[in-house]
Amino acid sequence: MAPAIRQLATGLLLALSWAPTTRADSSAADYYVKSLPGQPAGPPVKMHAGHIETDADHNGNLFFWHFENKHIAQRQRTVIWLNGGPGCSSEDGAMMEIGPYRVKGDQLVNNNGSWHEFANLLFVDNPVGTGFSYVDTNSYLHELDEMGDQFILFLEKFFKLFPQYAQDDLYFAGESYAGQHIPYIAKHILERNEKAGPDDQWNLKGLVIGNGWISPFEQYGSYLKFAYEKGLLAQGSEKAKQLEQQWKICRKQMAVDIKIDISECEAILQKILDVTATLTTSGKRNCYNMYDVRLKDTYPSCGMNWPPDLTDVTPYLRRKDVTEALHINAAKNTGWKECNGAVGSAFRAHKSKPSRDLLPDLLKKVPITLFSGAEDLICNHIGTEEMIGNMEWNGAKGFEVSPGNWAPRRDWTFEGKDAGFWQEARNLTYVLFKEASHMVPFDWPRRSRDMIDRVMKVDISAIGGEPTDSRIDGEKGPVTSVPPSKGSNNHPDTKPGGGDKGSSTNDDETQKQVDEAKWKAYYRSGEIVLVIVVIAAGLWGWYIWRDRRRRSGYQGVAGGDGAGPGHRAGARGLDRFQDRRTARDVETGDFDESELDDLHVETPREGPHKEAYAIGDDSDEEDIKGKGPERSGTR
């Protein structure tokens, strides 16, 4: 090949690699999920799933599952969802809370409260070793800044694979121990943005944390207060006196050093569940469900058998046809586990300060929404409300709007039912969901979607939709959700009062407007790439023509030589009650998935790294002598 042509070929390859589709799109195709077993009839949801490497030295890969939005209202948005633990899979969120589908038996049904109505959803099993993610078993993470660094690397590679989402408005949402993860990730994103050019910054627009484990000081102090308020314990009783003594021990330890989890304080929750347990007629003990105190469970599980959907979700995610659809490696031996006890045991974060300390600085730049289910004990609303009341940010303390005056609690009604209240001041919003558990979207999917739509300032009138009847202080604003689809086989909202029910307004005209909005959102990037390809082809043809005229003996470009590159929700308590359903089951299989060119988005394969990996391993429910069951890693 003539030097001029060789130089041109090199230049064209570099130019094309710069274009936002080329290599990223061809690699993204490897992640495409064509369909899911048991998927309901109707328009399919566009999905991508698979692993992205975040630690090449220790075979660390994070698993993601991405769902494209149904509608685009005003602008593109992406919600990145994380569950708790540490070590509990975000498939809890995908399959039991905010994702497009719920599992019934071996089939999927539509979730009318799915948050993908107006936002792309990205679920990530975080940190490495959680759920379908994996890493060498001696390389679990220990601190929150380590986790934050790896998550930034994950996002860099994800947006390189899917550049069409890189400029979306980004919202991080999650629950429980994600109350630690999310603020740390946000801090790392803001630090990255300070160093990045204007066109390379990520549009972090908000953080949304439900029943979060954020401030150990207030949360540990709330256990007894919540037990008294709900009538689980009688204040002044002998049992209460025992627990007050344990609270004194806890406070003494916190006076020395406040860590993210403190065993002397974890014991308070364990003892509440122990002393309030009752004997059944069969001689077995029943205890309160720590995630929803309206319910009971067998002791010492105390909520680990909940939610009931888990009995269908676990076998579904272990099916071979499902793991193949999600691009999980065939060498995986034991299948998906909700929580990985080894991850939780390693991730003690003893050198990390509680994320509560990050909130005042974050609130200067990013709106934050905290929400609570009123019936959750383990990360209860009293602790969250007291944390807010004690915290100073943006020039004042708590929800104070002027000296001595606090922002009011504004009544929230949803389709005529009392749903809770909203309270907000200086970039912080608090939402209380009445009659809701630790997993609010599980109980009230459509109410939770109404919340996220308000947070994202969705105006569905932009696509011709009709808002559902959601009112704050009697006012019905435009930033609300659509009613559910008529006749769909949705997992219903089953709370007393009839749940969240409605009818569909998504007619053909609405769909037409939605399609037009999608086209406008993606048109520009496709047009740019098309222009580049046309120019490149024209230049290439001109050089070939000119060289053939100059060298009559030339027989073709490259002569066939192949020119160019060929190549859970966690919960805490009961002495590290952080891991739900914990059962040690360390993976020993290898992982052999396709390399993604120079992105190193890969999984381990045969060779020097053939050793033990952890992929969502976890331990079975065990009665730890003298402690009750251990959830080594989940809030």
UniProtKB/Swiss-Prot annotation:
Residues 25-524 are lumenal. The active site is at S176, D376, H438. SUPFAM superfamilies: alpha/beta-Hydrolases. One of its GO terms (cellular component) is membrane. It catalyses: Preferential release of a C-terminal arginine or lysine residue. Residues 1-24 form the signal peptide. This is Pheromone-processing carboxypeptidase KEX1. It comes from Verticillium alfalfae (strain VaMs.102 / ATCC MYA-4576 / FGSC 10136). The lineage of its organism: Eukaryota, Fungi, Dikarya, Ascomycota, Pezizomycotina.
